[in-house]
């Protein structure tokens, strides 16, 4: 009510300063003041300020609810983001573990392959050495056989010229026995 009184006083002050009688229907300032007061009175009578205040209160409550919902959604989004970051760290850790395991397995497989290759090379070298030893023994045997044959031929020729048939036969038997003993 105090506000309304102050409003009337402020509205009436320019009208009082005008020339001529103020409370005349010919005075436009008076008519405007009356119309304004009538308008304000109608607004108050129909409780428009209360309705507008109620609408504003409802709107403010709606905004508060929207802000609360926004806060809740923000917190939920932060929780989801934090869980995704944790999951990403876990996945990165798992990926690092997988890479480390793969490297270890690759090194182990390389070592296995290296050992297998080394064993294969050793087997081949041993087989080659055995083959060389066999060829060497065969060559020694061949040389020995050739030397024996040459010695027999030379002995036969020498004995054939110097010895009688009975001596030759005894010499051949003796030589065969010697050769048999040496070969065994």
From Swiss-Prot:
Origin: domain of life: Bacteria
Pfam families in UniProt: ATP-synt_B
Keywords: ATP synthesis, Cell inner membrane, Cell membrane, CF(0), Hydrogen ion transport, Ion transport, Membrane, Transmembrane, Transmembrane helix, Transport
Membrane-topology annotation of the record: Single-pass membrane protein
A GO cellular component annotation in the UniProt record: proton-transporting ATP synthase complex
Molecular function per GO: proton-transporting ATP synthase activity, rotational mechanism; proton-transporting ATPase activity, rotational mechanism
Stretches that traverse the bilayer: 4-24
UniProt subunit comment: F-type ATPases have 2 components, F(1) - the catalytic core - and F(0) - the membrane proton channel. F(1) has five subunits: alpha(3), beta(3), gamma(1), delta(1), epsilon(1). F(0) has three main subunits: a(1), b(2) and c(10-14). The alpha and beta chains form an alternating ring which encloses part of the gamma chain. F(1) is attached to F(0) by a central stalk formed by the gamma and epsilon chains, while a peripheral stalk is formed by the delta and b chains.
NCBIfam families: PRK13455.1
Biological function: F(1)F(0) ATP synthase produces ATP from ADP in the presence of a proton or sodium gradient. F-type ATPases consist of two structural domains, F(1) containing the extramembraneous catalytic core and F(0) containing the membrane proton channel, linked together by a central stalk and a peripheral stalk. During catalysis, ATP synthesis in the catalytic domain of F(1) is coupled via a rotary mechanism of the central stalk subunits to proton translocation.
The name this protein goes by in its record: ATP synthase subunit b
Organism per entry: Paracoccus denitrificans (strain Pd 1222)
